[in-house]
């Protein structure tokens, strides 16, 4: 899969960003890998492009149950309505960007689920987050026709254990997920299938290969 390059767009130029995303085909995050135990599957898709300076990623979510109780970055964001992006720029390490529907983010550089270094506040502040829900405002679970979008603008420097200065030409592996561990209907969806007995997103052997257009 190739990530298209669209140069000259600033993340804060929302009209230009929306226009660029309109030309990108959405891809489903629809692999329900453990249907016997976790059959519930909200509708989730993502779109992605890069400018060289920024990786632009948008999740669109339609779900029945939504909650946002985590109020701090690097907290237990996976317990809320959470969209996740994992990327491995090489075989030795991967990064997990886990973001709730109100923009609280966990970011780590990892060799495995248990071997991790969390990003500093300065690195986290460099990742721009835009959500259609009130950003940063927590709420208990809501049941209904809940629809929300989350856009991330990720600079290459967010891969803080690598010396990246430009996304152009990068070859990597990635997977994208949607979860909500503490919701009344927990779910664990992925873009690429995960072939494990129990839910486990920290499995880079199941990532898909991607190339960022030069």
Regions found by a protein language model. Give the residues of each.
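Structural preference for beta-rich elements and adjacent junctions enriched in aromatics
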Residues: 1-214
């Amino acid at each position: 899969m190739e990530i298209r390059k669209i140069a000259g767009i600033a993340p804060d130029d929302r009209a230009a960003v929306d226009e660029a995303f309109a030309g990108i085909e959405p891809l489903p995050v629809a692999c329900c890998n453990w249907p016997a135990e976790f059959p519930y599957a909200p509708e989730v898709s993502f779109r992605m492009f890069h400018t060289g300076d920024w990786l632009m990623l948008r999740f669109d979510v339609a779900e029945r149950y939504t909650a946002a109780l985590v109020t701090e970055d690097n907290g237990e964001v996976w317990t809320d309505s959470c969209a996740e992006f994992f990327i491995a720029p090489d075989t030795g390490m991967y990064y997990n960007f886990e973001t709730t529907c109100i923009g609280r983010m966990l970011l780590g550089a990892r060799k495995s689920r248990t071997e991790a270094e969390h990003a500093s506040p300065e690195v986290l502040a460099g990742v721009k987050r835009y959500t259609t829900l009130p950003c940063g405002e927590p709420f208990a679970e809501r049941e209904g026709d809940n629809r929300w979008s989350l856009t991330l603008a990720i600079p290459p420097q967010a891969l803080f254990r690598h010396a990246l200065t430009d996304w152009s030409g990068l070859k990597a592996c990635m997977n994208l997920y949607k979860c909500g561990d503490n919701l009344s209907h927990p779910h664990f969806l992925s873009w690429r299938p995960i072939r494990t007995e129990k839910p486990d997103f920290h499995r880079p052997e199941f990532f898909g290969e991607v190339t960022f257009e030069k």
